């Protein structure tokens, strides 16, 4: 229905309309067939649903992980505790970091591993950075039916520069929140110059944990709607 702009796999291969890069008007597929173990970045003109038909993916499912950045699928009809899924990769020294489409992460802080994703959900893909190659196994015994964690409330005062989920996020991790005298409902934002590239509204849970992670969105290839690598980031509160 004219919503799709581009699809990209973890190797930066694309499926997009030829007119974006050439004089051709047909869609050009440099990805090939979609793979059940792979996730994909999808850019659309506005919010919409993608319906995929076919036979359900059989689990247990083994997903090959290579060193560096991977985009993995979650082709399971249900939800799973995210930390439980990736714990074997942590134990094996494979996992460096994993992010959801909004940039929330599971990563190691000085005080240990912090989980800001909570649950892997049906229909989602995840960006995984690995220290070395390995295999991630998704087991059916761990699947919960249709459970979704409560989403974080969007900020009211600060408005981020991008629409949707953002792109190629960086995480700004703030510790010792209680020493700053912030309260639940207060907002913290990250700025690249005058551009708000990420913001969160603090919750009681953030204050209990004394930490918060702010996903900030990178700029698009045209240099708009996100932070520019190498630029200083300023933190503001309200």
Where are these regions (language model features)?
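N-terminal exported-region signature
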Residues: 1-171, 175-187, 192-238
């Amino acid at each position: 229905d004219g919503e799709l702009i581009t699809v990209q796999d973890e190797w930066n291969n694309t499926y997009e309309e030829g007119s974006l890069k050439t004089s051709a008007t047909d869609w050009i597929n440099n990805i090939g067939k979609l793979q059940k173990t792979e996730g994909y970045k999808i850019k659309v003109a506005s919010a919409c649903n993608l319906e995929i038909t076919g036979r359900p993916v059989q689990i247990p499912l083994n997903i090959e992980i290579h060193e560096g950045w991977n985009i993995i699928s979650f082709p399971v009809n249900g939800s799973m505790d995210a930390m439980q899924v990736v714990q074997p990769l942590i134990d094996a020294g494979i996992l460096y970091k994993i992010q959801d489409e909004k940039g929330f992460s599971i990563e190691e802080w000085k005080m240990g591993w912090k989980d800001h994703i909570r649950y892997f959900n049906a229909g989602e893909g995840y960006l995984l950075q690995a220290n070395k190659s390995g295999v991630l196994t998704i087991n059916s015994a761990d699947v919960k039916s249709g459970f979704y964690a409560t989403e974080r409330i969007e900020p009211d005062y600060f408005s981020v520069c991008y629409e949707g989920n953002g792109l190629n996020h960086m995480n700004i991790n703030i510790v010792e929140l209680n020493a700053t005298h912030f309260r639940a409902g207060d907002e913290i934002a990250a700025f690249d110059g005058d551009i708000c590239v990420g913001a969160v509204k603090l919750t009681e849970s953030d204050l209990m944990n004394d930490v918060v992670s702010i996903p900030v969105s990178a700029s698009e290839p045209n240099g708009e709607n996100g932070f520019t690598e190498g630029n200083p980031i300023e933190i503001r509160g309200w």
